[in-house]
């Protein structure tokens, strides 16, 4: 026979789903137009040349090229896409 009454269930045991934020394409990586470079909350990284900023602060490529992260004098990190040099015709 049981000498202890059954314990209640724990009040813990819940967690939210991860949001998969962060850098998706790193410096020097090749991207095409539309590729997501960074997913973020707020602007930890700021948009530079040839990138767009989505309403959820996602930074994405507007042109094909290589990703470039630059820290400027104001302390902000800017993400740009450097277009590839076109082949001479």
From Swiss-Prot:
GO molecular function: structural constituent of ribosome
GO cellular component entries: cytosolic large ribosomal subunit
Cross-referenced Pfam families: Ribosomal_L27
Segments for region (Disordered): 1-22
GO BP of this protein: translation
Keywords from the named record: Ribonucleoprotein, Ribosomal protein
InterPro entries from the UniProt entry: Ribosomal_bL27, Ribosomal_bL27_CS
NCBIfam families in the cross-refs: L27 (TIGR00062)
Family that this chain belongs to: Belongs to the bacterial ribosomal protein bL27 family.
The protein, known as: Large ribosomal subunit protein bL27
Gene name as annotated: rpmA
